[in-house]
Amino acid sequence: MENSHNESEEQPQSTPKVEEEQPAVEQSPENQCSEDDQSSEDLSSEEQSSDEEFFPEELLPELLPEMLLCEDRPPQECLPQKNAFEDRIPMEQPPCGIGKHKLEEGSFKERLARSRPQFRGDIHGRNLSNEEMIRAADELEEMKRVRNKLMIMHWKAKRSRPYPI
């Protein structure tokens, strides 16, 4: 019986707190969000704090433009949706795995055959003396030999295991 009496006392105390919080939010005229967003923010104050921990604005501004536009801060700090991506500096080279060779048509062998003359041009395209050309060709041959040796060693090591990994 005492527990039910304590619970009834706690409920009236908690409801005025909610009523006191709501007028404070309604008094801010700078709020750019709609009234529906305000009511949902009041109801999920705990969820907001957890969202802020996992998704800080500094790390993901382009992914959360709606949040940035709805916040209570001066308009010069808010990022408009249109300019969020335009302000980025374009990359000089695409990241690994994305490049012209991915966009070109044809099979892997065709693309490889097209790229091979580029490597030949490294030696023959330059104005080198005969000695320099011979040295460059020797270096390429040595690289091929070492590569083949490593491939053979890898194949032997892989084949000599009694059980596959």
UniProtKB/Swiss-Prot annotation:
The keyword Transcription regulation applies. The gene is Tceal1. Its main location: nucleus. GO terms for cellular component: nucleus. May be involved in transcriptional regulation. Modulates various viral and cellular promoters in a promoter context-dependent manner. Does not bind DNA directly. Keywords: Nucleus, Transcription, Transcription regulation. Belongs to the TFS-II family. TFA subfamily. InterPro entries: TF_A-like/BEX. This is Transcription elongation factor A protein-like 1. It comes from Rattus norvegicus. Residues 33-60 have a biased composition (Acidic residues). Pfam families: BEX. Residues 1-66, 89-124 are annotated as: Disordered. It is found in: Nucleus.
